[in-house]
């Protein structure tokens, strides 16, 4: 049986439909075959008709595969027809493992847009050996969470003249006059993640997938309060810790660098840049409110049933409008600190940090446009740039899998760009 280059699973969902639309519109995918997959053939056909109307490219007769995360046989049949499965069905802690299992067992690589560290790391624990034996790649967090951040640190390491010691990143989501609301599916994933945090046993998983002790630089990251003022000469504002998957993904990439590439690992911290302290306090209170109420079944059900009201309309069942997405964008700032001197990996620097570098990553709407561009770039890399991937299959982070590839060019074609802004001695 011949395989499609890409199968988009969950193509009738809110995010999945955008992934298919940007695939159809991308010149990078010309000459590649694709299919859409999901539970309802009717909904999938409707998505294809809508995309045909929006793009002016007739894909109404594109291949459709009916598959369901609760039906192992259908997932196996889907995976047997794919070179790469793009999995856009979340929450992944509920529906993701069956798709990974089917892909690995049937010789398909798998990328997804999960931002759920516990699930992501459990997939490495359970499937990395089998994926390596099959020669396929499983790469999670290939959406906006966490390609911009993980590949941003990788970009900084490659462009730092000397030995990089630590990085602080700041991300800001920019909205237009129409405002912005994320789709409620992201909110439901957040609720599940908070409620499952106590039982995830993530520490034990990490000891298994990262058994070796790696040595990072002697200079530690600055200790920051939960809410603090940014006072870089290139950036000001207020910062709070970033609650997403970026830090966990980057730390796994640093482990891979140290143990597999013999590249010096760095210390890392991730933050959100806010325009005011008042907004920071509101976000903090909301997260505290969620963290308390997810513990109790009754209040958790209320949170799940009323995402609009319980998130103060930051999340909506309807998701953002087309205008809101068109007006939205994001920017990452990566501040790197290190030494202009280069030492062997097993030697530590002495003395003060003496070099600083700033890089940025900019792109369109983070939630859906950039996420589509990121996961499609990951799929393209698996298809077109195999020579620059790790030699063996397995479960990898984005930087571990794609750090030496052409993915930066693919990302740029979707409007996601990296720039070295400055580098100077301290």
Swiss-Prot record:
Listed transmembrane segments: 278-298
Disulfide bridges in this chain: none
SUPFAM superfamilies in alphabetical order: NAD(P)-binding Rossmann-fold domains
Xref: Pfam families: Sacchrp_dh_NADP
Predominant localisation class: membrane
Family under the similarity heading: Belongs to the saccharopine dehydrogenase family.
Name of the protein described by the UniProt record: Lipid droplet localized protein
Organism classification: Eukaryota, Metazoa, Ecdysozoa, Nematoda, Chromadorea
GN (gene name): ldp-1
């Amino acid at each position: 049986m011949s395989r499609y280059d890409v199968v988009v699973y969950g193509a009738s969902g809110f995010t999945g439909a955008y992934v298919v639309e940007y695939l159809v519109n991308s010149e990078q995918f010309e000459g590649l075959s694709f299919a859409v997959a999901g539970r309802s053939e009717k909904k999938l056909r409707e998505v294809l008709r809508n995309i045909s109307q929006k793009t002016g490219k007739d894909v109404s007769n594109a291949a459709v595969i009916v598959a369901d995360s609760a039906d192992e046989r259908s997932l196996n049949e889907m995976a047997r027809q794919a070179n790469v499965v793009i999995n856009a069905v979340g929450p992944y802690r509920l529906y993701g493992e069956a798709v990974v299992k089917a892909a690995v067992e049937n010789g398909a690589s798998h990328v997804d847009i999960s931002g759920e560290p516990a699930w992501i790391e459990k997939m490495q624990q359970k499937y990395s050996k089998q994926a390596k034996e099959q020669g396929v790649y499983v790469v999670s967090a290939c959406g906006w969470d966490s390609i911009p951040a993980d590949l941003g640190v990788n970009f900084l390491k490659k462009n730092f003249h000397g030995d990089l010691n630590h990085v602080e990143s700041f991300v800001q989501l920019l909205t237009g006059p129409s405002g912005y609301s994320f789709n409620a599916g992201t909110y439901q994933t957040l609720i599940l993640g908070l409620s499952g945090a106590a039982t995830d046993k993530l520490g034990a998983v990490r000891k298994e997938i990262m058994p070796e002790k790696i040595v990072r630089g002697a200079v530690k990251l600055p200790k920051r309060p939960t809410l603090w003022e940014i006072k870089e000469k290139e950036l000001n504002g207020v910062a709070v810790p970033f609650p997403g998957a970026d830090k966990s993904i980057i730390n796994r990439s640093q482990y891979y660098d140290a143990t597999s590439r013999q590249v010096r690992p760095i210390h890392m911290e991730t933050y959100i840049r806010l325009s005011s302290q008042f907004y920071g306090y509101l976000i903090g209170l909301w997260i505290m409110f969620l963290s308390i109420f997810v513990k109790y079944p009754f209040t958790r059900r209320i949170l799940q049933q009323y995402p609009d009201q319980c998130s103060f309309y930051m999340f909506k069942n309807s998701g953002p409008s087309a205008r809101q997405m068109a007006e939205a964008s994001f920017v990452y700032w990566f501040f790197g600190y290190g030494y202009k001197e280069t030492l062997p990996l097993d030697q530590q620097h002495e003395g003060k940090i003496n070099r600083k570098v700033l890089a940025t990553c900019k792109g369109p709407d983070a939630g859906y446009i950039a996420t589509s561009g990121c996961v499609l770039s990951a799929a393209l890399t698996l298809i077109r740039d195999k020579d620059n991937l790790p030699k063996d299959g397995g479960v990898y982070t984005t930087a571990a899998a794609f750090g030496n590839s052409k993915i930066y060019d693919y990302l740029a074609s979707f409007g996601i760009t990296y720039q070295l802004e400055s580098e100077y001695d301290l």
